[in-house]
Design a protein with these regions (language model features):
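Bacterial N-terminal signal peptides that target proteins for export
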Residues: 1-5
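Bacterial N-terminal signal peptides
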Residues: 7-16
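Proline/serine/threonine-rich low-complexity linkers at boundaries of modular beta-sandwich domains
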Residues: 15-27
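Short, solvent-exposed loop/edge segments of extracellular or virion-exposed proteins
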Residues: 28-33
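Short, solvent-exposed loop/linker segments at the N-terminal edge
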Residues: 34-39
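Hydrophobic core residues within well-ordered beta-strands of beta-rich domains
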Residues: 41-43, 94
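Short, surface-exposed alpha-helix to beta-strand junction/turn motifs within ectodomains of secreted
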Residues: 43-72
Length: 323
């Protein structure tokens, strides 16, 4: 059995390709510091993952800082590469600036390359200051964090409630069961309610931050892949809130009544996978591992929170009754 698990793990590790954190610039034609022939009319850039063409742009500048391209950035060979055309370039040094929006997680990445045309040579000392940068800022990280924590608590609570709490209620005895169930119901509703509100607030902040980042309207953001995933996440959050209100009206929460919340939560964490970088590989294995990681984190972290803020206070109520 151990050998089987080892070989399964080995196959997964070997079979998974490198995953980049963002759409970094991998290569270009002409390449960094290269010499291109006089009359060059196009520049091609290649990235580590797919980019959104509507919010991605290449610009070409001459040594005097004048923009000399035709402002016609387009896909070249698939969604991982861009092309821009120029009038026939003359002898000189040119700079290409790249601003691309990830089609996976909605991150903006900036980069630049320099190349010479004809006899012109690139000053290599200038290349030392050239580096890619991701235009992230604190509000984006703050926007996603409460949503991740909230979904972890909801899913972990649903799993532990079904696996442990739902099967142990029969041991409390008929005399104590009514009061215990009432206490459990109150604690469960409070914890999962706060978690779902965190997810909802996080969703609104995420779309607001992305709107500001792209300097566009929320409707335009919804037209991106990030926007489609956000919309799916928002719908699932509303569904979960509906399930929460339905559970709130029940007099007693049995194990089966937690199942709808469990199913919706399992789908909700899949949206986190869709915004993860394993999705950029377009392969099943990285996506599965990312999803399993989110699932196990929910069982562990969400389960601990459920035990600490729902189960233990409920059992403390039982101790008080016995006294």
């Amino acid at each position: 059995m151990k050998k089987l698990l080892f070989f399964t793990f080995l196959i997964l590790v070997i079979g998974i390709p490198s995953v980049y954190a963002h759409p970094f610039l991998l290569d270009s034609e002409p390449s960094q510091a290269a010499s291109a022939p006089i009359g060059t009319t196009q520049i091609i850039t290649k990235y580590s993952e797919a980019v959104e063409i509507d919010f991605s742009e290449l610009k070409v500048f001459d040594s005097d800082g004048n923009q000399v391209d035709n402002r016609d950035t387009t896909y070249y060979d698939g969604e991982n590469s861009l092309l821009i055309t120029t009038p026939p370039l003359e002898d000189g040094v040119y700079t290409v600036t790249s601003m691309v929006l990830s089609k996976v997680d909605g991150h903006l990445v900036l980069a630049a390359i320099m190349f010479g045309v004809g006899e012109a040579k690139v000053d290599t000392s200038l290349l030392e200051s050239q580096e890619e940068s991701e235009t992230t800022f604190l509000p984006e990280a703050a926007a996603r964090f409460p949503g991740i924590v909230g979904q972890t608590v909801v899913l972990g609570s649903a799993i532990v409630a079904i696996a442990i709490w739902g099967t142990r209620q029969k041991y409390f005895g008929k005399d104590n069961l009514t009061l215990i169930s009432k206490t459990y119901h109150s604690k469960f509703s409070k914890v999962t309610g706060i978690a779902l509100v965190s997810v909802l607030v996080s969703n609104f902040i995420m779309i607001a931050v992305q709107t500001v980042r792209l300097e566009t309207s929320p409707l335009d953001v919804l037209g991106t892949t990030f926007g489609a995933t956000w919309l799916m996440r928002m719908i699932l959050t509303i569904v979960l809130l509906g399930i929460w209100f339905w559970m709130e009206r029940k007099s007693r929460l049995t194990g089966k009544k937690h199942v709808p919340m469990l199913i919706a939560s399992l789908v909700l964490i899949f949206t986190t996978t869709l915004l993860g970088h394993g999705t950029a590989t377009e392969l099943a294995a990285p996506m599965i591992l990312d999803y399993v990681h989110s699932l196990l984190s929910s069982v562990w972290i969400g389960g601990v929170i459920f035990l600490a803020f729902v189960v233990l206070p409920t059992l403390a109520k039982l101790d008080w009754i016995d006294k």
